[in-house]
């Protein structure tokens, strides 16, 4: 795809997002504030013994999230271990214990890290009853937690922040399921396959034979993108023509990735009674996205060497049907959200180009971030920003009329610390423990030296931020990485949720402070700039040393 076509694709994505973010955001606000339950929802509530009018305190909401997720891990793990006895197993054996644990954790945490080749490892029953179900409910849990935090800002003098079961069921049945049905049909029309054909042996034009896998791909592809999940039906993910056959399906999948995350700030603004607040959050997200995408595109278009110059850019690892701009747009959207899907190989990017997806995740995936996690991550950074502004002018910080006291800033700070600790400690242990280091360097790392370090840093960054993309040169299906990355995914998902829900409970219990002439306006460009600055500075101070040892050093050496 040439440069003009790539630019037109970017413009079309932007136009569609501008058109849909308001109605979709308003729809979600009405959905989560509604007191009406459908007949199907009432039946589910009776079945599971839930009173939809009964709300939960933040500890009760948290316990429900953890219990539901634990059951999800056990179910997905069990399906994998029993695969040989399940229908539509395609003759595939049970998945090994370590890989089953890693995969179960991966899909329940919305990470979708895949240390295996899906078409050669998972039968259709595991794909549909296990992985696809988690694609829906893990996304719904993320949105529910974000809505709980929004209620914390919107409510006053109350001890409750909603009902997890109501939020979960509404998010699944009213939002994700109907949108996925529509988008799956569109993807089928675009050439994405949907069948139960299994493996087909066909004769090639050269006179040989080839085994071609089939499967119910479109139905899983829809929620994979819409729920910012990212796990592919095939090993090549969206670079595979059965998942993403054309340039327009690639653009459509980018829209799916960004639709809910960019619409949730509008939901936030509607629920707190000031849509300008949501617009400010969208402005921050959009600015960071544009800068990151532009930088990545420049690095790839200006790849050094004879081959990149002849091809008009670094085409290694990219599909000819997409080209550079469509590939960098997809890669930026995938790593600035929590999707992690790929239509090009990030490990084959230039040194500085490969650094950009890593930085996108290190920012905390807040521009716009995952379904729900992007909004609550950005609101945590907004709390940090008003605290910094309060220190500068000597006033007690407040945000949306809620006082940001010691408890609130401690919770926000703990949230910020979780993923850097997981990334840096996980990477350090991979090289500090002699037995682990020998295994990593001898078995897992394909490229030694600076890029080998980058591969390990990328893996832990992806796992801790629940992204799921990878530098594919790293062989991750080993006992160390299956366990270490599994733990990173668990802690990276649920520790932040603990702090977010605790913050929601603390804010909901407060009264609203009247606005005065000294109140910091959080809907104006000045606050947008402050929030962008805090986001970038926190990331730079935390990760610059390891980036200097990896991709920056590699880029300077190339």
UniProtKB/Swiss-Prot annotation:
Keywords assigned: Cell membrane, Ion transport, Membrane, Potassium, Potassium transport, Transmembrane, Transmembrane helix, Transport
GO cellular component terms, A-Z: plasma membrane
Localization (cell): Cell membrane
Pfam families on file: KdpA (PF03814)
Membrane protein topology class: Multi-pass membrane protein
Membrane spanning stretches: 1-21, 59-79, 85-105, 130-150, 179-199, 245-265, 279-299, 374-394, 416-436, 484-504, 527-547
Molecular function per GO: P-type potassium transmembrane transporter activity; potassium ion binding
Domain of life: Bacteria
Main location: membrane
HAMAP family (UniProt xref): KdpA
Assembly behavior: The system is composed of three essential subunits: KdpA, KdpB and KdpC.
Family per record: Belongs to the KdpA family.
Matches recorded under NCBIfam families: kdpA (TIGR00680)
Protein role: Part of the high-affinity ATP-driven potassium transport (or Kdp) system, which catalyzes the hydrolysis of ATP coupled with the electrogenic transport of potassium into the cytoplasm. This subunit binds the extracellular potassium ions and delivers the ions to the membrane domain of KdpB through an intramembrane tunnel.
This protein's name: Potassium-transporting ATPase potassium-binding subunit
Organism of this sequence: Clavibacter michiganensis subsp. michiganensis (strain NCPPB 382)
């Amino acid at each position: 795809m040439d440069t003009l076509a790539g630019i037109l694709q970017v413009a079309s994505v932007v136009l569609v997002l501008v058109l849909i973010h308001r109605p979709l955001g308003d729809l979600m606000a009405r959905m989560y504030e509604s007191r009406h339950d459908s007949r199907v929802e009432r039946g589910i509530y009776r079945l599971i013994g839930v009173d939809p009018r009964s709300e939960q305190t933040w500890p009760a909401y948290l316990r429900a999230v953890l219990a539901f997720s634990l059951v999800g891990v056990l179910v997905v793990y069990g399906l994998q271990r029993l695969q040989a006895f399940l229908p539509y197993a395609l003759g595939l054996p049970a998945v090994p214990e370590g890989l089953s644990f890693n995969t179960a954790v991966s899909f329940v945490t919305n990470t979708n890290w895949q240390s295996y080749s899906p078409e050669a490892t998972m039968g259709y029953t595991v794909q549909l009853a296990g992985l696809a179900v988690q694609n829906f409910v893990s996304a719904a849990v993320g949105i529910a937690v974000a809505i709980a935090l929004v209620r914390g800002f919107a409510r006053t003098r109350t001890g409750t922040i909603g009902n997890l079961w109501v939020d979960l069921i509404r998010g699944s049945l009213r939002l994700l399921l109907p949108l996925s049905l529509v988008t799956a049909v569109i993807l089928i029309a675009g050439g994405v396959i949907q069948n139960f054909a299994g493996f087909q042996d066909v004769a090639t034009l050269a006179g040989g034979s080839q085994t071609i896998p089939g499967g119910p791909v479109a139905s899983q592809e829809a929620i994979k993108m819409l729920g910012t999940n990212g796990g592919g039906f095939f090993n090549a993910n969206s670079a595979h023509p059965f998942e993403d056959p054309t340039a327009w399906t690639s653009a459509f999948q980018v829209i799916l990735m960004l639709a809910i995350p960019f619409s949730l700030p509008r939901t936030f603004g509607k629920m707190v009674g000031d849509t300008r607040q949501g617009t400010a959050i969208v402005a921050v997200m959009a600015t960071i996205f544009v800068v990151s995408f532009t930088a990545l595109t420049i690095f790839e278009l200006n790849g050094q060497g004879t081959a990149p110059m002849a091809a008009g850019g670094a085409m290694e690892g990219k599909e000819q049907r997409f080209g550079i701009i469509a590939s960098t747009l997809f890669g930026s959207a995938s790593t600035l959200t929590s999707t992690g899907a790929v239509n090009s190989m990030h490990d084959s990017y230039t040194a500085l180009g490969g650094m950009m997806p890593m930085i996108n995740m290190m920012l905390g995936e807040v521009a716009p971030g995952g379904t729900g996690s992007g909004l609550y991550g950005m609101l945590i950074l907004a709390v940090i920003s008003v605290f910094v502004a309060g220190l500068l002018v000597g006033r007690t910080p407040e945000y949306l009329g809620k006082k940001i006291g010691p408890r609130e800033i401690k919770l926000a700070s703990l949230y910020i610390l979780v993923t850097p600790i997981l990334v840096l400690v996980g990477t350090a242990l991979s090289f500090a423990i002699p037995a682990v280091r020998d295994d990593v360097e001898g078995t897992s790392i394909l490229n030694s030296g600076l890029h080998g370090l980058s591969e390990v840093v990328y893996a832990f960054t992806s796992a801790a931020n629940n992204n799921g993309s990878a530098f594919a040169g790293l062989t991750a299906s080993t006992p160390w990485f299956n366990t270490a990355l599994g733990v990173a995914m668990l802690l990276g998902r649920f520790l932040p949720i603990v702090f977010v829900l605790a913050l929601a409970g603390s804010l909901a219990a407060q009264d609203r402070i009247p606005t005065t002439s000294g109140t910091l306006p959080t809907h104006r460009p000045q606050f947008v700039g402050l929030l962008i600055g805090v986001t970038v500075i926190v990331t730079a101070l935390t990760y610059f040393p390891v980036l200097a040892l990896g991709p920056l050093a590699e880029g300077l050496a190339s």
